[in-house]
Amino acid sequence: MAMAMRLPAISRAVTEVASSPVGLRRLFCSNASRFSFLSPPARRQAEPSTNLFHSGLSKRITSERSLWNRIFSRNMGGGPRTFPGGLNKWQWKRMHEKKAREKENKLLDQEKQLYEARIRTEIRAKMWGHPDSGEKTAKLKQSHGPMSPKEHIKTLADRFMKAGADDLWNDNDGPVKKFDQGSRSCSDSIDSTPIDVRRLVSATCDSMGKHRVLDSSRRGFSSMSRFKRNESSCDEGDDVDAKKLDTLSPFSPKFSGTKEKVKSSTSVVGVIRNKGLFGRRKFRKNDSSTEEDSDEEGNEGKMIGWMDLRKTGSSASLGNHDIKLTKRVNRNVTDEELYPPLDINRVREDLSKKQSVDNVMEEKQEPHDSIYSAKRFDESCISPLTLKALSASGIVKMTRVQDATLSECLDGKDALVKAKTGTGKSMAFLLPAIETVLKAMNSGKGVHKVAPIFVLILCPTRELASQIAAEGKALLKNHDGIGVQTLIGGTRFRLDQQRLESEPCQILIATPGRLLDHIENKSGLTSRLMALKLFIVDEADLLLDLGFKRDVEKIIDCLPRQRQSLLFSATIPKEVRRVSQLVLKRDHSYIDTIGLGCVETHDKVKQSCIVAPHESHFHLVPHLLKEHINNMPDYKIIVFCSTGMVTSLMYTLLREMKLNVREIHARKPQLHRTCVSDEFKESNRLILVTSDVSARGMNYPDVTLVIQVGIPSDREQYIHRLGRTGREGKGGKGLLLIAPWERYFLDELKDLPLEPIPAPDLDSRVKHQVDQSMAKIDTSIKEAAYHAWLGYYNSVRETGRDKTTLAELANRFCHSIGLEKPPALFRRTAVKMGLKGISGIPIRK
């Protein structure tokens, strides 16, 4: 009965304390003591139930312990574990590796010191030993004598010899120069007789009473008695000739005397040296305390010199190997030999030789014919079929650029060519390209599995690539089987592939982006480019700039190294010339047809500048256009704007004002750009509003006026824009329209003949007409122009530096184009431009 009453209590206690291991232990011990009151028979009856309870309880305990371990403990597997000092295992490992390296370096230093000590001991033994004591030397070598330098070097070399390797040691290894034995007397032979103090004192007093020779010499020696770290106390280099004593007496400048006085002082010094009475000297760490005494007979006419610092190292360690035995005799050089008189005539001749090709050719030519040379195309090594095509086009004479570059390019040399705009650069590299293709096709080395591409021409814009392709096809119209293809953006990728496979393509003209797309998409173009012979980069300063540099590098990696490379541009800054080493060989030619100190623009192009408030620019441009149209019946005008959307706004405004205008910018489709470009080439009385896509290389004939609204990106871009007029030696005008806060750009153009002119007075009727036309333009075009204008001037370093001022200028531009308030920017765009939180820049929520 009692047993039945106690069992429920035990079960309740188990459930209450089963969650902790401590409670389980207490429960187990208390239940074991509770059965002690029973009699032995009853206890035996209760043992089965007790055993059952113990087994269940033990299982519960083990399960609870396993659960406890799973929750509150973890294995030593993954996860960060720290070592002493808060280091992880990699830091701990690197620390011990560093300690091991330091320990190894210490051992090597100790071994090096032991080696140097052994070498010094060996040298002393050889230099001081008796030449006749062969038995004694043999005994020392048999017992514990020092190792020779050869033996020690061979022992060190054997440490690094792998097992099984051949021993390549020979007698030629080791010291190059033999030590001169017998040059020094033995240390045992030094006179060890007692010093005659009376003789020493009398001689000292005698010399001091005369001219203090001993005092000066003693002071000179004592000044050198202490040596710096790692220096020697050897006195071998301290003996000088007595004749030089007058020049070696900084402590006694009035020292002078006869030979007898010098002899008396020398005798005293000789006594001191022979008796070893220099006293004990204090040496620092790693200093040598060895004194090498010279013989009496050989040093009678010598004495100690305190200023002879020819040697500061130990002679015992290196002997005479660290001394230059023969001194260089300084000959007396006159001022005339050092600075010869300048020959004025020779300097003038050198300067005349360095004149540019431009100035030289101008002397030979007529004054009105500025770009053509006297050389004809039929005088050069050009194929007859190409000459026939040139004659059909009316081209007979070469330009100066073609005359200077054609011979170099036809010889297969790499060249970097700088020439003015509109001087025939395209023809200068197309003719060598055609000759390269003809030579490669006639050589017929091997049979190509795929049709090879022999010439690759890179251009920055689509219009320029299309223009060069048209010129190349005109030159190849009499050649059969030679084709010119273009790879430019704005066309279908699949159509480009089909055209390359179906039509002949020995000359490929491409823009970097589309060419890289074909290379990376494994269209088979890479294998065709492996037979490339000539690589041409037109407008190299732009293609090798930061914008195209990565794409050009990837393209160059796919081209063979054995090729000819040509780089052409009207402007070549120093940075671009450094980067040009990626394309050109080291021995390339640099052909500058402009010349140092010459103006990079054409002389026949009149350049002017108008500084006017930015709010009046959209009123001034129509006024300037109408004024030029009235003065020039056969006008052809190009208006350059900063961005594509500002170009679209300017085009829409001029169209609303009933002007004959066209537009080209990057936002337009390629078909539209090609049609407008061809129309502008063939027509007159037309106005082209464009962005920088038409600034480089485009040959628009008979352009009479170029207007640049706002500052260009840099000086080079201004020159390229202006180069659209005045081509082929003709005249033209260039006008730069800037705001007052853009005056800083004029400092970059100070070497150009830019004439400032005042802004014209605007009629109120013209202003009203412009305002009415601006009000008709869609708001979306204005907002896009505002965003593009803000992004452009934010990227310009001078204007984008001060964001608050930039916001004020943007608000002025906003009001000038007819917007009541500036349109909001996306938050992400504002953050990228650094305009978040700037007053006057609204953010779209």
UniProtKB/Swiss-Prot annotation:
UniProt biased composition (Acidic residues): 289-298
Keywords (A to Z) from UniProt: ATP-binding, Helicase, Hydrolase, Nucleotide-binding, RNA-binding
Annotated segments matching region Disordered: 129-149, 282-302
InterPro entries: DEAD/DEAH_box_helicase_dom, Helicase_ATP-bd, Helicase_C-like, P-loop_NTPase, RNA_helicase_DEAD_Q_motif
Single Gene Ontology MF annotation: ATP hydrolysis activity
Domain Helicase ATP-binding positions: 406-590
Domain Helicase C-terminal: 624-778
Enzyme class name: hydrolase
Motif mapping: Q motif: 375-403
Keyword field contains Transcription regulation: no
Annotated ATP binding sites: 419-426
Enzyme Commission no: 3.6.4.13
Pfam name, any one: DEAD
Protein's UniProt keywords contain GTP-binding: no
Catalysed reactions, as listed in the record: ATP + H2O = ADP + phosphate + H(+)
Motif, DEAD box: chain positions: 538-541
Protein family according to the UniProt entry: Belongs to the DEAD box helicase family.
Domain notes for this protein: The Q motif is unique to and characteristic of the DEAD box family of RNA helicases and controls ATP binding and hydrolysis.
Protein name: Putative DEAD-box ATP-dependent RNA helicase 33
